[in-house]
């Protein structure tokens, strides 16, 4: 993908008892620290093009959530929402990033909500099309088998055409990066995370968050109007913005709309 020259390096840090891997963009001279947490089967490298853009304005750290990419993985690790949220907080502490901004997409958005509830060093929170499933609510619409099938195909070296049906709206460029990294997603991690999408009460977390919150919604995504209305009821201070022409993987489908949705919420406009 076209580089803007903000990539600094990839690195590991021991935090919350595991090896955590991240990609850094921008550096301290770019602006305040910002941690970006991708979704359920999105290693950090698949969000590198977003990191490149964020790195123009912020000291950006794109995280490999445990069980993905180059972070620690394996069947014996705990992949619960609580633990993943503590990973983010521990990463920020280990890298001395406090205070910091936090952005999370999909599952990463749920991780970010839980992290914001436990860490007041998070100044502002941006949730990007996070699933609003949970106890007493409609189930998460994407079945676990779909994720595991794609991972197994990638593990055996599937072609782009074999993987394309899972992300049919993506460009070949985005699909190539996903094909390169999808095999790193640990099946135990994905299974536990998917289960948590049905059982974790993220609404209680969101209602308790004290920081300023922006919720970016995909206009063509899975979140219903009723689900968004519930967010407005339980957390009326949350600012909601819609990217009308994008599905759930918003930046892969409309990067300019994604960037524009932030406006000046983070204190500075993202340099488009």
Task: List where the protein language model places each region.
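Conserved HGGG/HGGXW glycine-rich cap/lid loop of the alpha/beta-hydrolase fold
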Residues: 14, 18-73
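Conserved acidic catalytic loop of the alpha/beta-hydrolase fold
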Residues: 83-100
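Short beta-strand immediately N-terminal to the catalytic nucleophile in serine-hydrolase-like folds
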Residues: 102-104, 128
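Gly/Ala-rich beta-loop-alpha elbow adjacent to hydrolase catalytic centers
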Residues: 104, 108, 112
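Flexible "cap/lid" loop of the alpha/beta hydrolase fold
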Residues: 113-117, 121-154
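Conserved alpha/beta-hydrolase catalytic His-Asp/Glu region
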Residues: 135-142, 153-208
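Conserved loop-alpha-helix segment in the C-terminal half of the alpha/beta-hydrolase fold
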Residues: 213-246
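Catalytic histidine-centered segment of alpha/beta-hydrolase-like enzymes
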Residues: 246-259
């Amino acid at each position: 993908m076209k580089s803007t020259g903000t990539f600094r390096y990839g690195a590991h840090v021991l935090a919350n008892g595991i090896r955590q891997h991240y990609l850094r963009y921008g550096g301290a001279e770019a602006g305040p620290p910002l941690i970006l947490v991708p979704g359920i089967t999105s290693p950090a490298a698949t969000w590198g093009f977003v990191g490149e853009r964020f790195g123009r304005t912020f000291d950006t750290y794109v995280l490999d959530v445990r069980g993905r990419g180059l972070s620690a993985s394996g069947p014996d690790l705990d992949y619960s929402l609580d633990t993943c949220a503590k990973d983010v907080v521990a990463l920020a502490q280990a890298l001395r990033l406090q205070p910091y901004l936090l952005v999370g997409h999909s599952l990463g958005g749920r991780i970010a909500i839980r992290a914001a509830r436990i860490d007041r060093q998070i100044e502002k929170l941006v949730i990007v099309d996070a699933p609003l499933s949970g106890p007493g609510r409609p189930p998460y619409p994407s079945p676990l088998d779909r994720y595991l099938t794609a991972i197994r195909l990638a593990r055996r070296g599937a072609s782009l055409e074999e993987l394309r049906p899972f992300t049919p709206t993506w460009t070949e460029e985005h699909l190539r990066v996903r094909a390169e990294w999808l095999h790193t997603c640990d099946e135990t991690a994905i299974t536990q995370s998917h289960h948590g999408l049905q059982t974790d009460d993220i609404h209680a977390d969101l209602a308790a968050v004290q920081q300023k919150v922006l919720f970016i919604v995909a206009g063509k995504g899975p979140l219903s109007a009723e689900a968004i209305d519930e967010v407005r009821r339980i957390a009326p201070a949350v600012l909601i913005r819609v990217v009308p022409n994008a599905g759930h993987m918003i930046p892969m489908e409309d990067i300019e709309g994604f960037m524009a949705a932030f406006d000046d919420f983070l204190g500075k406009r993202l340099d488009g």
